[in-house]
Amino acid sequence: MFSTLNARLADVGVETATIGFFSWLGITYSIKVFWAPVVDRLKLPFLDRLLGKRRSWILLAQAGIATGLYLMAHVDATVAPEMMAFCGLLVAFSSATQDVAIDAYRIEVAEERLQAALAATYIFGYRLALLVAGAGALYLAEFWSWQVSYEVMALLVGVGMVTV
């Protein structure tokens, strides 16, 4: 999301200094350690009973990502850069939270001998998603629009939600 967001902001004429400010959204992955204990200990009402603690956090995080991306599709960054930043923060925070929950889920459900293979599979999926969200989003934006691009990315996250 971050590389395509920079391209989108530049494409619509947002000032370079403002685009630089948006790079702070990436810090969420570095500071996820501060809310990881909450994800580790807090059971989400209703969802926990249906899916269990880890899967409920994964689903909530994916809902946050999809919502943030969908909202970003409909925000004009030249008119409301603060709203775009809020949506970006929602995506970044939700993405980092998903990372915490998926790691915890992987550790709990698999035997120790399978951990390396599962971690590698997760990283492969993450890298594939980066490619789709990067090159795929840029391709869609070039041939259709940024709005369509972000809506499709939100829809793809929705597909992932079905697998939880």
Describe the residue ranges of each PLM region:
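Central cavity-lining transmembrane alpha-helices of secondary-active solute carriers
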Residues: 19-45
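Cytoplasmic helix-loop-helix junction between adjacent transmembrane helices
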Residues: 90-125
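Glycine-rich segments within core transmembrane alpha-helices of 12-TM secondary carriers
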Residues: 28-35, 116-141
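Helix-loop boundary and gating motifs at the non-cytosolic
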Residues: 1-29
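C-terminal ends and interior cores of transmembrane alpha-helices
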Residues: 44-45, 56-79
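Transmembrane alpha-helix termini and helix-breaking/packing motifs in multi-pass membrane transporters
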Residues: 40-43, 47, 70-74, 131-151
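Symmetry-related core transmembrane helices of the 12-TM Major Facilitator Superfamily/SLC fold
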Residues: 59-66, 148-164
